[in-house]
Amino acid sequence: MQKLQISVYIYLFMLIVAGPVDLNENSEQKENVEKEGLCNACLWRENTTSSRLEAIKIQILSKLRLETAPNISKDAIRQLLPKAPPLLELIDQFDVQRDAGSDGSLEDDDYHARTDAVITMPTESDLLTQVEGKPKCCFFQFSSKIQYNKLVKAQLWIYLRPVKTPATVFVQILRLIKPMKDGTRYTGIRSLKLDMNPGTGIWQSIDVKTVLQNWLKQPESNLGIEIKALDENGHDLAVTFPEPGEDGLTPFLEVKVTDTPKRSRRDFGLDCDERSTESRCCRYPLTVDFEAFGWDWIIAPKRYKANYCSGECEFVFLQKYPHTHLVHQANPRGSAGPCCTPTKMSPINMLYFNGEGQIIYGKIPAMVVDRCGCS
């Protein structure tokens, strides 16, 4: 009996020395583990708006396959930008990206931009420096954006200077070829007759799709073209080498290409604004202003709504995969927590100068956040 009492005293003494036992210790450890696992892989949610904008700039350059932003000044843009109907229509009717209601579908976009149209300006060529002692216009060089897409349309646009009296104008588009035995250097592409009235000059388009297809199949046959637009007195009205005051009137090629559509799937998420107190994963508005970047090489849009995702992702909230919660409960230390990320992204249309001075109209995929979710 005495031994039992001694054992009890020793036990009580150990309790006093060791201090009280915290019965909540295990639960706190478990909670800490859960907090650690919540978003070790998604600390980017704490990024500021400025870092998000910097990321968008890097994305755009990467998707356009540009190492740096094209160095084109506003003055150069005024000279290079054609004052022609197809380009003016693109700018006037440009679908500036808006945060319109989404159907919740998720498009499987490619990473790089998809080209829809290319406006190609003439360039200098060693093959077309002089013919018959005179410099000739025009030589067009084609990038891979045209070569590796399905050609839908190819139009040559030329500007005809105004006439003082009603006149009939004969337009000829000639293709330069290698000298034949009889000395012939040209073969006809198109010819047409136009009746012009006094007033302002006019833009005229000519279908050159067949010629362009041949050039793409046999690049060595592309030696350039000559443009003539003669009135009854033999005066050439075509602007081939712009004179002072004729900026933006240089001939150019408008090429349209097509691509195959992508499949889609369904998804949904929460929408918030900057004043929202919502702590869960949500989509927030963010406007990208290219003029603020100093990116004058982007013709349109000047700004667009990109949006971003932010918020907490608890394991029981907006689970993308139902089994994720069970896996985490079984092994809380071994599973990374879900992250608030875009679950639907859509492209933006863009009209821009590339590094070669060509005007490109196309789509840049995955530049607008339409939905956010936890995954």
Swiss-Prot record:
The identity of this protein, by name, is Growth/differentiation factor 8
Single Gene Ontology MF annotation: identical protein binding
Report the subcellular localization. Answer: Secreted
Source organism (scientific name):
Bubalus bubalis
Which keywords fit this entry according to its UniProt record? Cleavage on pair of basic residues, Cytokine, Disulfide bond, Glycoprotein, Growth factor, Heparin-binding, Secreted, Signal
| Residues that carry a glycan | 47, 71
Indicate the annotated site residue(s) for Cleavage: 98-99
Matching entries from Gene3D superfamilies are given as: 2.60.120.970, Cystine-knot cytokines
User: An example of a Gene Ontology BP annotation on this entry?
Assistant: positive regulation of macrophage chemotaxis
Propeptide cleavage-removed residue intervals: 19-266
Similarity section: Belongs to the TGF-beta family.
**Gene Ontology cellular component annotations, sorted alphabetically:** extracellular space
| Pfam families the UniProt entry points to | TGF_beta, TGFb_propeptide
Name the principal localization, coarsely classed. Answer: secreted
Q: How does it assemble?
A: Homodimer; disulfide-linked. Interacts with WFIKKN2, leading to inhibit its activity. Interacts with FSTL3.
- Ranges in coiled-coil conformation: none
Task performed by this protein: Acts specifically as a negative regulator of skeletal muscle growth.
Q: Does the UniProt entry include the keyword Isomerase? A: no
- The intrachain disulfides are 272-282, 281-340, 309-372, 313-374
Supply the SMART domains for this chain. TGFB
Q: Which residues form the signal peptide?
A: 1-18
